[in-house]
Curated annotation (Swiss-Prot):
Keywords: Alkaloid metabolism, Methyltransferase, S-adenosyl-L-methionine, Transferase
Enzyme Commission code: 2.1.1.-
Subunit structure: Homodimer.
Tissue specificity field: Expressed mainly in vasculature and cortex tissues at low levels.
Gene Ontology annotations of biological process type: methylation
Origin organism lineage: Eukaryota, Viridiplantae, Streptophyta, Embryophyta, Tracheophyta
Protein name (database record): O-methyltransferase 16
Family annotation (InterPro entries): COMT-like, O_MeTrfase_dom, Plant_O-MeTrfase_dimerisation, SAM-dependent_MTases_sf, WH-like_DNA-bd_sf, WH_DNA-bd_sf
Binding positions (S-adenosyl-L-homocysteine): S195, G219, D242, D262, K276
Amino acid sequence: MAPNNVDNPQNCVVNNTINGGVGVDDEETYGYAAQVLNSCVLPMVLNATIELGVLHLVNQAGSGPDGLSPAQLAALIQARNPDASVMLDRMLRVLATYDVVSCTAVPTEDGGFERRYGPAPVTKCFVPDEDGVSLAPMLNLVIDKVFLQSWSKLKEAVMEGGIPFNKVHGMHAFEYPAVDPRFNEIFNKAMYDQSTHIIKNILAKYKGFSQIQQLVDVGGGLGHTLRVITSKYPSIKGINFDLPHVVEHAPQIPGVEHVGGDMFESVPKGDAIFMKWILHDWSDDKCLTLLKNCYKALPENGMVIAVETNITDQPETTAYARAISQLDVSMMTQNPGGKERTRREFESLAKSAGFARVDFVCCASSFWVMEFHK
């Protein structure tokens, strides 16, 4: 009798072909294709476990057999659905296949086993840290219906031009929050959490703020980045510069002045100008206009401190390269001309705006700190 392959899904080859003619040699390829076509499942499941509080519980659990069973998790979140434990088990199994959580099979008295879930290294990225921030709000933003709807217009944008987000919503992504308070709150929370996390890592490595007296944060949102910077460097006078509808909601921060305006018209003067994830939002023409305004606002020997990703010239298969390539297409879909840039592209932009040189100083949380020197 032929061996039973049912219990091992990897042994699913029948008569040298599967699923309409994919050959044995293509088994791994087909499996990868199946993963790609269902890749939207991962962020949706992850977001649901975050909203349910399940990921937080898993992060607090022990590892291996000390992890939490689906039944325990269902009880802890007080789910009324009798099928909740089965649903959670299936959801967490997906996360375990991506190493978002860990999973251990523990034998049961009836000769079977139950899966118990605990934290993996990346789990902590999606639960609040000591500052109460995580990547969870950014995930919530990425899968929000406002952004998801834009993808339906990507093909049309390729064929006919235009920005997918604008085609759906009738305005660009930085105008939209002013007319949608719900989305504005989601956007601001995502920016706050990611900014707080990354700026702390930057301050641990980057020492370029030590001699600055007046620092302008262009596109600084509600001023949280300047709050963190000025907490470490209290001698700095901070100017938080953003659109009027943004700064009107900004809280009072000691040593920080909130200024509303249009960065494509002018930029407040300072010893240095800080821009985090601003250049990647805009086209080369818009960035050139902005950088020229920055150049005018700086004294001799002043500099722009820009925090951005550096995309590689050739595609790579590392997690970093995939993340940056995905972000690049997200910028293309959601933002007015947004893109991730190579080092050469940043150097070209800076020099076209009049800056003498670009220094790539350090990398923190996958983002490069660059100095554009006047």
